């Protein structure tokens, strides 16, 4: 029996956030297909462009039809991998989707070398400068503890020729949500199984931030794992404290790839204050369940002081489109995100509308991720492919830190002030597989369908250079 099936049974019984409200069952588990290639944008070689952070790129495999890694890259480039592979949610509450060996399978796709997009591919797609110089700190807030975090990050960065980033040099720092040492990892039982799953999310977050800003410092902050019906306010309170810890430690940007139910406790008072820090960019995933169909977006992407990051499908050939599962919606507890124009909030009856901006999130065009933490199954994932808006949020946080123009940042305000030339407008795609905009009076179609200008799936578009940041 596949030992991972026992772990996924936990997922199917837990409650997941769908459109900012809890739903049980498989609604949050996306049976989509995915895969990608490190060299997808520049050809069939593993990496063709110069490293964004300097160093030598290691090609994982020679170009040849018989090599399975090369074949994955070619299939992704052609968009045909969706015919034979699937994808599933990585963990409850998080917005990551891991590619599986085949449709209907829970077993993650394993590759002997990077098969998803790497830093150089994404830099080319977004028109980023060849070199990264910033040493600003990107804080990543995750649940649970990953004992292999540092070594897995080192392997990822070495594979793509990025500068080393470890605890000895001070480039990588690990803290718990109150600023102390991270707790010991769970060694057995359901806790170990959950931490094994969450480790994929953690690796994705750190790898994505590294890809966006290869020279930035990284601060990984762990919050206790909570997922019960009554633990929503406990969890959001812990995440809020973690943001304060990150800011106190000097973070320039903070990324959260988790979503919780919005309620009066976390949309006001101390929690709201903790996620409002002028001069610090705070990004959050909009989720992977399409248009939310309700009056509340998932916390914390619903907050005015947070940049809500949606998702696109990013093929090697042809324009990007809005990812079909990218979260979008309204938050009626607020009139607008900071700096959000009336033309945007009109889609939600002049309330906070999401998303603000977007980046690659489709697991079909997802990121190369390296993760070996397997305390429960004993079966490391190694190289795999992961998408979801958990990929786009830390990437955008990395761009904020890399650009360094943060003094006026509060929520997405500076993005809306930037010229249109700083973005690639995404004009195709819809996220109505779960709910349709037409079924909700007062909701405009732009919340569900990508088109010219702002839309719910992709916000004002995906980055074109660093000018907007």
Name each model feature, range by range.
Residues 329:
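Phosphate-binding P-loop/Walker A region and its immediate neighborhood
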Residues 397, 404-453:
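An often Trp-containing, charged/polar helix-loop segment at the C-terminal end
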Residues 2-50:
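Secretory targeting and sorting signals
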Residues 50-285, 289-311, 333-387, 393, ...:
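Substrate-binding/charge-relay-adjacent region of secreted/lumenal peptidase catalytic domains
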Residues 323-324, 454:
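Signature tryptophan residues that serve as conserved aromatic anchors
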Residues 315-321:
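Short acidic, Gly/Pro-enriched loop/turn segments at secondary-structure junctions
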């Amino acid at each position: 029996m596949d030992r991972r099936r026992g772990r996924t049974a936990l997922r199917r019984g837990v409650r997941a956030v769908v459109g900012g409200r809890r739903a049980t069952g498989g609604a949050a588990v996306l049976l989509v297909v995915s895969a990608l290639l490190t060299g997808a944008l520049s050809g069939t070689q593993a990496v063709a462009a110069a490293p964004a952070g300097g160093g030598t790129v290691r090609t994982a495999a020679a170009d040849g039809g018989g090599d399975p890694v090369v074949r994955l890259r070619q299939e992704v480039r052609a968009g045909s991998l969706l015919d034979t592979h699937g994808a599933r949610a990585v963990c409850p509450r998080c917005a990551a989707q891991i590619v599986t060996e085949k449709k209907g399978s829970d077993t993650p796709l394993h590759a002997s070398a990077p098969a998803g997009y790497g830093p150089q591919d994404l830099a080319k797609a977004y028109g980023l400068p060849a070199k990264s110089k910033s040493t600003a700190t990107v804080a990543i807030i995750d649940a649970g503890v990953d004992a292999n975090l540092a070594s897995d990050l080192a392997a990822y960065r070495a594979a793509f020729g990025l500068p080393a980033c470890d605890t000895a040099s001070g480039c990588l720092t690990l803290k718990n949500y109150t600023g102390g040492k991270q707790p010991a990892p769970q060694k057995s039982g359901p806790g170990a199984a959950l931490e094994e799953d969450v480790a994929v999310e953690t690796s994705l977050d750190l790898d994505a931030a590294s890809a966006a800003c290869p020279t930035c410092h990284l601060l990984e902050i762990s919050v206790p794992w909570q997922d019960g019906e009554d633990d929503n306010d406990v969890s959001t309170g812990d995440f809020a404290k973690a943001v304060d810890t990150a800011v106190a430690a000097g973070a320039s940007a903070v990324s959260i790839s988790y979503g919780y139910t919005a309620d009066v406790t976390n949309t006001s008072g101390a929690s709201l204050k903790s996620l409002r820090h002028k001069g610090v960019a705070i990004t959050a995933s909009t989720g992977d369940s399409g248009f939310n169909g309700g009056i509340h977006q998932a916390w914390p992407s619903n907050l005015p002081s947070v940049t809500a990051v949606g998702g696109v499908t990013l093929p090697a050939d042809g324009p990007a489109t809005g990812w079909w599962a990218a979260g979008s919606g309204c938050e009626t507890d607020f009139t607008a995100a900071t700096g959000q124009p009336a033309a945007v909030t009109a889609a939600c009856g002049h309330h906070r509308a999401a998303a603000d901006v977007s980046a690659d999130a489709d697991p079909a065009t997802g990121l190369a991720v390296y993760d070996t933490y397997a305390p429960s199954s004993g079966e490391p994932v190694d190289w795999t492919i992961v998408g979801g808006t958990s990929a786009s949020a830390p990437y955008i946080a990395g761009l904020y830190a890399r650009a360094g123009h943060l003094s006026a940042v509060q929520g997405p305000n500076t993005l809306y002030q930037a010229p249109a030339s700083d973005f690639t407008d995404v004009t195709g795609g819809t996220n109505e597989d779960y709910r349709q905009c037409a079924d909700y009076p007062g909701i405009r179609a732009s919340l569900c369908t990508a088109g010219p200008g702002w839309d719910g799936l992709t916000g004002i578009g995906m980055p074109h250079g660093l000018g907007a940041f």
